[in-house]
């Protein structure tokens, strides 16, 4: 079965204006088979109290600017790696299903934005 569970951590709750800071994707039914990556979002304007991650999101996720600076990768690289993980762990003869807890109102909107930005580059 080609079912994958997708979860994003983001800089806020608006999927149209905020950015992804962490990707987690896991093949359903395979406990130790997953992919995660920190993603560098757009920097905040000069003079902001933080570079990437607002304090309320740090409190919620535990993800800090330091973690993003040291381990974050470009959005295009993160998107490529996410798709590579899915393709490498799929049976090419069967459809791929991607599920998410808040898919239609949150994660899938970010997912679509990432795909569109990747294709445009």
Model-derived features with residue positions:
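Conserved non-catalytic scaffold segment of RNase H-like nuclease domains
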Residues: 1-116
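Short, intrinsically disordered, charge-balanced linker/junction segments flanking boundaries
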Residues: 117-121
């Amino acid at each position: 079965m080609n079912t994958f569970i997708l979860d994003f951590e983001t800089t806020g709750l608006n999927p149209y204006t905020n950015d992804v800071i962490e990707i987690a994707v896991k093949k359903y039914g395979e406990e130790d088979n997953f992919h995660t990556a920190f993603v560098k979002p757009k920097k905040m304007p000069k003079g902001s109290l933080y570079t990437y991650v607002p304090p309320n999101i740090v409190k919620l996720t535990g993800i800090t600017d330091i973690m993003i600076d040291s381990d974050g990768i470009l959005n295009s690289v993160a998107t490529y790696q996410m798709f590579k993980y899915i393709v490498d762990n799929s049976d090419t003869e069967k459809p791929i299903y991607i599920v998410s807890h808040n898919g239609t109102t949150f994660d899938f909107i970010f997912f679509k934005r990432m795909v569109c930005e990747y294709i445009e580059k």
